[in-house]
Amino acid sequence: MSSKAVAHPNIAVWIMALGIAFSMALVLTAVFNANPWEDHTYDLAPPIVAGMPAPHRDGREKMVCSSCHIVTPPAIGTGPGSGTLPIVQGTPAPHVDGREKMPCASCHTIVKKGSVAKGAKAAPLPAAVTPGMPLPEAVSVALAVAPAPAAVPLGNEAHERMVPFRYQGKVVSIAGAGARSVWGDIYIQINDGINPPIWIDLAPRWYLQAEGCVVRPGMFVKGTAFRDPTQAAAGLDYAMSVMANGEICALRDNHLNGLWANAGGMDAEER
């Protein structure tokens, strides 16, 4: 009887300690809910103009600027009125390459609705336009996206002629059969703001969904891929891995064999 009486308080203490530890874990998880594997603050870092010195002096100046910042091309001209179109006050920015986060007045003349900017030089009227005809104050131009290169059969010895490289950048466009069907391959066009945009063949859409690496336009992705040196950036590259949504997904092995071949896609429609 005495041994049982001594054991009960010890069990109660351990149960109470485990309950306190579990409660503290819940509180800390709710307070510090930042996932260290999530994508870094790529969308929060201010854009950097290509050719400008790095704004950091704590060691980050040795890193690639496009890892955290959107690199924009240098502006032509020295200020407002140097060939840029005016912007009507209150309208959304006409850019989608990172410049939409910059103050519009840095490059454009801000025009109030229904008025003409003071001191702005009137553009010459086209020959077919008569005086008195209202002219548009701002123009939104849609940028054309180059179509994705056609995929070619790789063969068993494709890895011997292709070279590996690292890629990173923002997803500009998505193409391939995976854009229409869960069973098709997904091609992404990425732009790092410095080099010409490239097309990369990732994997079937169901495999990306199963691995948690679904990509969308505007996302920052990076990884490793194989490229045919005879085609350079004009051809279709083949990804070995991709990091998206904070997840790192292996897509192909060193012989360019898709890892989804042994994964199976029986329940892909349910994911």
Curated annotation (Swiss-Prot):
GO terms for molecular function: metal ion binding. Binds 2 heme groups per subunit via the 2 magnetochrome (MCR) motifs. Heme 1 binds at C65, C68, H69. Keywords: Biomineralization, Heme, Iron, Magnetosome, Membrane, Metal-binding, Transmembrane, Transmembrane helix. It holds the Pfam family MCR. Heme 2 binds at C104, C107, H108. A motif (MCR 2) lies at residues 87-110. SUPFAM superfamilies: Multiheme cytochromes. The chain crosses the membrane at residues 11-31. Coiled coil: none annotated. Residues 1-10 are cytoplasmic. It is found in: Magnetosome membrane. It is a single-pass membrane protein. One of its GO terms (cellular component) is magnetosome membrane. Residues 32-271 are lumenal. This bacteria makes up to 20 cubo-octahedral magnetosomes of about 45 nm in diameter which contain membrane-bound crystals of magnetite (Fe(3)O(4)). NCBIfam families: MamX. Required for correct biomineralization of the magnetosome, may be involved in redox control of biomineralization. May function with MamY, MamZ amd Mms6. This is Magnetosome protein MamX. It comes from Paramagnetospirillum magneticum (strain ATCC 700264 / AMB-1) (Magnetospirillum magneticum). The gene is mamX.
